[in-house]
């Protein structure tokens, strides 16, 4: 006889199912489960008197016969492709199955076999996302990495050599010597890493040698001189060696205007950093480049979202990061030219329309490395409050908006930088970089961070307590963040030409590594749920932004979710 159970009782036991709705933390964002693959009445769950026991939900099969290393039971997946309830199987550090876990000898529809070799993570009541990708990192200090991991970021791409003056301002690891040292340093960190070389050179040989030394991309930055000639040279090398180019354009318009930069790019694929312009770029109209089909536009998080405090904090940040002197009027004028209320307000709306594709941090260089995910969903919340439901959504849920915004920090930066074969989504075959969130803490404090199939970070109580939960409970690094466990669970991303040249062997790298691929034939249309290409115009006098003739403006937020309610500091 089938047994009927109330939705509330079912959700409390196995987590929410199809049709159930969840409020995300203290935002106004509502998620609704679209599908459930766990089979009612045949769910697996670990614990005393529960299902995953020998001869019941646990099979007699061996690992060699298909048993997974880890099963995450009854997980609610939020990804660009859907919002579904499912079990997740992990084997050899990769996602091996999404669907129904258990024992095929006693249960039907099992595609994830649980056995004696299987560890269990309870996903009931948790939301699972792919580990976030921060594609705008200034590697100023190594402590950034723990802070990023604690927030749910598992991949960091950028440049730098430490707190050098150049690194404080630009995301470049210049030259083979510094690239080699950073690749060797990466061996000790429990996240995926990749480093950008300096792209500011008209001599192509100076750029090629950096890519062949191990750079996974090149960065053009105005502080090194982003001239049309440098842009053309850098993109030519990138096309030859299949790496992405990131650009911070010429705020002062010394070498040309935004139209000249677009002309120099010549339709080639490029990732434009902080495309609104407060972080740097042609003043006042770099934002119009987000309508170009070959441009992948991103934001950095200090302007996410537009608040009462956004403008005030930017001036001092800018002066420090770009080595400017407040006693020099020209330096102050340079800084002030980048900070515009009108373009920052428009940036909010362009994200909601899917015209801006990526959000990153700009870590310690006008951005906060631990706030990529929280700022993303603060923006989503603000836009729901100010603009209402998206046309693709309804009064029951914000599913399309949630999928659009999660894509900005997961799959889209992965595609942009040629690493989507390995990371960026919860899909079979990809590295098991997964973040588990309790709904009340979604976007602000992960419960667990799984890195390459092993727990790298978790909320953990007093180590001297008799159980794991006594206070003080806070995020702490776990076993796979230490020792040689880092090597098989984390990837270092290199150019394919560097791998062919034997860089990992020459530098005696022990970490797993992978090449970046297919960065040059992608376009704005490759961006999941964020491929809108409106025609952008900026009034040169008022700085008002228009998309397809419509004025884009919104008020600054006075109060935000995912903020002081959750944080003591």
From Swiss-Prot:
Organism expressing this protein natively: Prochlorococcus marinus (strain NATL2A)
Assembly, in brief, is: Heterotrimer of UreA (gamma), UreB (beta) and UreC (alpha) subunits. Three heterotrimers associate to form the active enzyme.
The prosthetic group or cofactor this protein requires is:
Ni cation
Q: Which GO terms describe its biological process?
A: urea catabolic process
Q: Which of the residues bear the PTM N6-carboxylysine?
A: 219
Q: What is this protein called?
A: Urease subunit alpha
Q: What is the lineage of its organism?
A: Bacteria, Bacillati, Cyanobacteriota, Cyanophyceae, Synechococcales
Q: Which residues form the Urease domain?
A: 131-569
Q: Which family does the entry's similarity section mention? A: Belongs to the metallo-dependent hydrolases superfamily. Urease alpha subunit family.
Q: In which pathway does it act?
A: Nitrogen metabolism; urea degradation; CO(2) and NH(3) from urea (urease route): step 1/1
Q: Where does Ni(2+) 2 bind?
A: 219, 248, 274
Name the residues annotated as catalytic in the UniProt entry: 322
Name the residues that bind Ni(2+) 1: 136, 138, 219, 362
The family database entries (InterPro entries) matched by this protein are listed as: Amidohydro-rel, Metal-dep_hydrolase_composite, Metal_Hydrolase, Urease_alpha_N_dom, Urease_alpha_subunit, Urease_AS, Urease_asu, Urease_asu_c
The record's listing under SUPFAM superfamilies reads: Composite domain of metallo-dependent hydrolases (SSF51338), Metallo-dependent hydrolases (SSF51556)
Q: Name one GO molecular function term.
A: urease activity
Keyword line: Cytoplasm, Hydrolase, Metal-binding, Nickel
| Annotated localization | Cytoplasm
Describe PTMs of this protein. Carboxylation allows a single lysine to coordinate two nickel ions.
Q: Which Pfam families match?
A: Amidohydro_1, Urease_alpha
Q: Which reaction does it catalyse?
A: urea + 2 H2O + H(+) = hydrogencarbonate + 2 NH4(+)
